[in-house]
Amino acid sequence: MIQHCPVLIVLLPLTAALLCLLFSKFNKNLGSWLVIGSIAGSLACSLQVLHQTLTSGEAIHYWMGNWEPPLGIEFVIDPLSAVMAVLITFISLMVAVYSKPFMRKEDWLHIGGYYTLYGLLTVGLCGMVITGDMFNLYVYLEVMSLSGYGLIAMGGKKSMLAAFRYMLIGTIGASLYLISVAYLYAMTGTLNMADLGERIMPYLSSPPFALAVACLFIGFGIKMALFPLHGWQPDAYNFAHPGSAAFIAGVMSKVPAYAIIRFFFYIFGVNNPIISTALTVLGILGIGGVLIGSIMALAQYDFRRMLAYSSVAQIGYIAIGLAIGNMYGFIGAVLHIINHAFMKSALFLVIGGIQYRFGEINLYRLGGLNKKMTLSTITVTLAALSMVGIPPTAGFFSKWYLMLGAYQGGQYFYIVILVIGGIQYRFGEINLYRLGGLNKKMTLSTITVTLAALSMVGIPPTAGFFSKWYLMLGAYQGGQYFYIVVLVISSLLNAVYFFRILEQMFVQHEASLTEINRHEGKLGLPPEMAIPILCAGIGILVLGFYSVDIVDDILKSGLPEVFLR
């Protein structure tokens, strides 16, 4: 059974998703628990393959139907893809359980449809990170996209329009990637990624390869909401179903970023002119994302919309880390993918909890959040501090590695941008003028908000501190000091804004809110929602405390060959 763990990561949630509606017909809750159980099994398999790759020091190759590549499709799991699989399945499991209270009043068809789409979204995301075949990646990309469109459309109000807009733009992105695959296949005659890496060498300076890279870059840029290709994201995050929004916002844009990493650093290599040019463009767009995303967040009054634009800025951090082009910049980018997934998921979990309890997320009617939802407020605070980059949160270390890489590469401009991007969070990440007193009603949510805010600022020992640390370290070693300045300024902006969040939650008077789902006690939410929020908050701290171990024992063991020479 253990040897089949790679395929079970995808097969378990796929089977459960296909059977979900049938089981829900007999018992409306049975199908949902089937999907939740399958995701738990997928998480167990992901942990197993991660342990196996780390102990053996070798990548796992699983041939589908025992067809040897390059003719057959294979799953390839190295430390990086295994970490991504664990990240996806863990957050997926948390959010799947978290969604249960939202479904209590729904009929079997609605519940079954929701969890069918949710299971398929997990399948698509997991498949994208473990497949070793270019066309197979496209198939999983479409599975991810179609299920994501459906979950967004289930959010009500303007969600159908948001999903339709995302579908139109997302289809362009997927089509561009498919065109890229066609060009690469025409040049090399293979779809296997490892085989492609060997056969593409004579074409690395050719115009068809440049066109293929451009299509791949734009296609995945759309999917990861890279500035200025992010137009679909604000409405998609804002109107997505509150149960699934944390999974969509936390993970869905990170997997396309991983795909760019896989192609540029592991298959093509970064030492040829075309990829170097692409990384330079990526860095420029990353700078634009940090600045424009921050500015746009300042102008928002809707909680989710602010977080959507902040995600544009955070994707900019990842882009800058990759553009720095050295080991520490790379580590900072990957670490920020992991940390931001937890931080953003934590924030959206709390938002969903507020919406579940009060029926609204109007920032001017949530006074006293720290008194009503204390744990949620603390978690948001930790996430915010981590995103700002306050040590020892995880966000600090990812930004630190970005800055160090920029410094070592002599790219000081990136440092300036990273600093500016962090400062924006003080003014535009989450405007909580009406969150006073919520800690009394939703203690767990308040704690979670506090943790998330601290992590987003970058307060140690949360996760956000460490990701920013590695980003700065990469910029420093690369001599790219501008990146370091950008990281520092962005962190200051984060700090200014998120400390204001704490002021609103813990100091301001309570606002008059009508509770549509009343829950007494410190948790302030049903256990199915409180436990995932608590796990997200703890995850931010764990990623911070063990950031060095994650980098040394996991990420460095899966570095691209270019950094090992």
Give the predicted meaning of each segment.
Residues V76, C126-G132, T188, R262-A278, ...:
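Helix-coil boundary and interhelical linker segments in multi-pass alpha-helical membrane proteins
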Residues A240, M373, L432, N439-T446, ...:
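Cytoplasmic/organellar membrane-interface segments at the starts of transmembrane helices
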Residues A17-N27, M94-E106, Y149-K158, A162, ...:
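C-terminal ends of transmembrane helices
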Residues M1-V7, L18-T116, A194-E198, K556-E561:
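Transmembrane helix-loop-helix hairpins at membrane boundaries of multipass inner-membrane proteins
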Residues G65-V83, E198-A212, S276-T280, Q408-F413, ...:
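Short aromatic-rich membrane-water interface segments that cap or initiate transmembrane helices
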